[in-house]
Amino acid sequence: AVIGFGEAGSCLCQGWGRSDVRAFDIKQIDDTNIAADKTRQMQDARVSIGDDAASTVREADMIFSTVTADQAHAAARAVAAGIGQGAYFFDLNSCAPSTKQKNAAIITEAGGHYVDVAVMATITPKYHQTAMLVAGEHAEAAIALMLALDMKPVHVPGPVGRASTIKMIRSVLVKGIEALTAECFSAATIAGVADEVAASLDASQTKDGWKDQAAYNMERMTTHGIRRAAEMREVAITLADLNIAGRMTAGTIAWQDQLGNLGLSLLDTEGLEPRLSAIHTALDAQKGD
């Protein structure tokens, strides 16, 4: 069973290509504007459509939770009402270790086997074969099940939260660089020095040019900023649990959230300047409102 049929959940189902998967997404009942699209996506993926989380997982031996980070705890509670004894609950959500430990307590009390899973790359290129870290008491048995589904799990020895810790701390840099890029190139473009700044940065690296990277980062933030901001709030919890002040992370949350809430698609807009122009036009329109 799959709980949450956004990008991750739908990609898993497409990658598996199985007809014995049952799926549910809370937007089927909470958002009438999206419900029809969710139903159509599930039909296209050839999965059975559940009516709610509890009934969707009731007969499932394996349950994959792929909701947004801010809904992960609620999803665990909802699944606990229907999970079978000994069923495996794979928590793929981008959550703080302490959040996953709370989720584990709920699933364990309900009789399920909780598995901490961290998805370590964008899921679209490789779908179900995307690299994933797996931790917790049931990790080894869970990995055997994942391998049977042609997935690519890697065991991280340690308790629930260990895999998530690696991802959360990595995200400080990955999502932080995106936010810094937005801040840097917004200022550089407004100041009329984007080419000079990019050239200076290009001279210090050997991979893709910084303007290309900045254009890519902008698209990622407008497309996935809301979800990434939710993940970064969990990163902030992770840092707080480690007694580290997440000053940069706070700024990252603000940038990801702001651009994600623009409702802007940049997939058909090529290049840094056109993408920044679209972003700042949308931001100016918000100010006018």
Model-inferred region functions:
Residues 1-58:
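NAD(P)+-binding Rossmann beta1-loop-alpha1 motif at the extreme N-terminus of oxidoreductases
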Residues 3, 95-175:
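Rossmann-fold dinucleotide-binding core
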Residues 16, 42-43, 107-108, 146, ...:
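A generic structural signal for well-ordered alpha-helical segments
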Residues 18, 46, 60, 86, ...:
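Short, well-ordered alpha-helix to beta-strand connector turns
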Residues 53-114:
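Rossmann-fold NAD(P) dinucleotide-binding segment
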Residues 166-272:
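Helical "substrate-binding/catalytic lid" subdomain
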Residues 269-289:
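Short, basic/aromatic-enriched C-terminal tail that caps enzymatic domains
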